[in-house]
Every structure is written in structure tokens, then in C-alpha cells.
């Protein structure tokens, strides 16, 4: 290394929470790689900068954060030059408390200010005091971030930030702000950039992604349905997913896209939270169970082979046995494939936190176990029905458990492993005969692939 070269610094990022946080962490990595020539490491003990990207959805998020920070405090003692930063939704909500309880933390930043990390690091180096920036500067961060580097055949693309629904249980509007959509040209530029790097599948992200209303160059407003048609026309992009959606924003135009755009996958994650109208009203969800079911049935009419997944909150204040049974009926009726389900925990500052909650914890745990068992049974039934089918999968790499097998995903998000020793198939589509259904994956045999001359 010459005397003029700057030594490479190492960056460790710990990510909690949703896919938006995963996306943000990847962008931090790109950003600091460009601004400070940093490279990622999986070992915090060798890092020059440690960042934790936090999530405040679940209870005890704060305590988990301080537990993690406590482990890194010793690293700071060993290396006073180490920079420790806290980002994400807990930082946005609890910035002052973090600075007070963990004075060894150098940077505190929210989801909307991560693009200012390089400047924050320089400020810290120059004046030595903790730098806190948890403001909500609209959509500015996307203007300041470098184009992303692809990591594999699939990529997340954030198309909007925040949520304006203010469900009574949810902290997101307070930590990520109101809904703000990226301009269409910005989204398209990122998708095209990823496609040129070999990305075949994009997953469009937003806390309430189907509320997307992006400005086009001519001043018109483009919704998610129209944006999907634009992205489907990008050369190289063959699969499109989006998450997370809100039932109220699931428009007729978006339902119709399932009939028009084959690149849109046959899998939809649409959180409902409860199958009880009474609980939905208390949650301020803005729709009934019947309205929710009607939308799913219309989507299934356009795409008969589609699979559905959802979110469920068990033990919301006032939930009765009848409310829970209504949720179980909805799960049966809609044949949900997978779910994110958990016991309600009050989030500070939300309206539901003030509601009386007299349901015993043991009852909540029993209900959650029953719900998760039902979903697992339904998922296995769907997997077994796929045995004997030839499924088109996007090959993403080698199987984690068996390097002699390649692995990929079906349209309905099933992991498929199959025996193949040709690494050229990674990043390509393949047709695989499904031969066995396992609890968390499928196993099959390669029938054909894009590498074949007669592929179609």
C-alpha cells in the first residue's frame, strides 16, 4: 500500500425488523463504501464502525438494543476510535434516551436521515460529541444515496416511506413519518440499474406500498398498478413482488394488474391483523372482514393459482373467544399459506396502549399456538399439492444445507432445492419437477432451464 492510499476501514451492520430495514442497511453499506471506502465485515470485533438498524414493532425493542450496545461498550473501551451508531425506528422514537443511557454511542439517526451518515461521522470526528439527527426531511434521502450494488438475482427497491393510516396499535407513522412516494423516474432508474447488474426479480417496498402515488416527469401522478406495468417492461426484470400492503389501498386497478402483467408473481402478502369486525374497528383498520375477503376473491379470480399470506395480532385488548374464532374462520376460508403472527404488545404513544387488557397471557399464548399450527398445516397442504407439478423457479445459488444442490424460489415463494452441478444456472430460470414436500422447502429434479437451446 502506497503512502497516499487510505487504509480500508471495516463496517459492521446489525439489522433488526422488516425488509425496509434490510434495504436501508444495504444502502448504508453502499453509502459508506462510496464515501469512506468502507468494506463490510461479519465480525464486530474487527470493525471500525458498528451500526445497529433497529425496529420498534415488537415489545422490549429498547431493552434488546441496550443489551446489544452493552456488548459493544467493551469494544469501545479497547478501541476508543471505534464509532458506534444507532439507526432505525427505535432511534427515531428514543433518540434522547439512547444518548443518555448509552453515552458511548456516537451517532443516532432515523430512517429518513441515514443518507447523512458520512457528514455525521465527520462531525463526530471533528468535535467529539454525540451526533443526533432523527428529523423527517421528506424523501431527501433517496436523492443523496448512491445507486445500489446488486447482491444476487433478487433485489429490494424502496418506492415510498412512512404510513398515514394511524392504526391504533402501530408506531410506524410516529417513527417513519407520513407517506411520501419517490418520483417515478427515480424508481425506474434504480430498477434499470439493478437489471443491468443481472437482477431478475424486484421486490417493491413500502410500509404501505400500495398507497404509492409517485410524480411522473409530466406532472401526472402514477399509482402502484401503473408503476408495476412500467417495471414489467424493463428488459431483464421477469418477476415483480411488492410488500407490505394495506387492504384499504388495494384498488380495482391493482387487482386488474394480476390479469394483465405476468411478471407480477402469484403470491400476495396482505396483512389483515384480525378476522373480527369488532377488533378491526378497534384497531382503526378502515375495512370489514367481508371487504377484505371480497378483494382476495377478486384477485384469485384473475390469478387462480395465487397464494396468500397475512399478518395477525393475537390478544389485542378486548379480544374474546368469539373474536379469535372469527380470525380462525378467516384463515380457513382464505387458506392462508404463511403468516407473521404474534401476541399484541402495547407500543408507547399509540392509542391502543391505553386500552384495558384483561386477557390472561396464557390464553394469548394458547391462541397464538393454535393459529400458527393451523397456518403450518395449510402451508404443508399447499406444498403437498405441488408435488408432481413442474414449477418454474429463479435459481439464486447453492442450497444452504447441501452445496451439491442448487436452490431457488417458485412464484408463490416456496424454496426449491434440486441436484445440479452447473453453477452457470445461478441467476437463471429453471423448470423443476417437484418430488417431495418438506416442512420449509420442496425438493425436485431439473427438467429444463434457460441454458437449454429450446427453452421457452
Swiss-Prot record:
InterPro entries: Elp3/MiaA/NifB-like_rSAM, Methylthiotransferase, Methylthiotransferase_CS, Methylthiotransferase_N, Methylthiotransferase_N_sf, MiaB_methiolase, rSAM, rSAM_horseshoe. GO terms for cellular component: cytosol. It is found in: Cytoplasm. SUPFAM superfamilies: Radical SAM enzymes. GO terms for molecular function: 4 iron, 4 sulfur cluster binding; metal ion binding; N6-isopentenyladenosine methylthiotransferase activity. Its EC number is 2.8.4.3. It comes from the Bacteria. Residues 9-126 form the MTTase N-terminal domain. Pfam families: Radical_SAM (PF04055), TRAM (PF01938), UPF0004 (PF00919). Residues 384-448 form the TRAM domain. Residues 149-381 form the Radical SAM core domain. [4Fe-4S] cluster 1 binds at residues 18, 55, 89. Its cofactor is [4Fe-4S] cluster. It is an enzyme of class 2 (transferase). Keywords: 4Fe-4S, Cytoplasm, Iron, Iron-sulfur, Metal-binding, S-adenosyl-L-methionine, Transferase, tRNA processing. The keyword Nucleus does not apply. Coiled coil: none annotated. Binds 2 [4Fe-4S] clusters. One cluster is coordinated with 3 cysteines and an exchangeable S-adenosyl-L-methionine. [4Fe-4S] cluster 2 binds at residues 163, 167, 170. Monomer. Belongs to the methylthiotransferase family. MiaB subfamily. Catalyzes the methylthiolation of N6-(dimethylallyl)adenosine (i(6)A), leading to the formation of 2-methylthio-N6-(dimethylallyl)adenosine (ms(2)i(6)A) at position 37 in tRNAs that read codons beginning with uridine. This is tRNA-2-methylthio-N(6)-dimethylallyladenosine synthase. It comes from Cellvibrio japonicus (strain Ueda107).
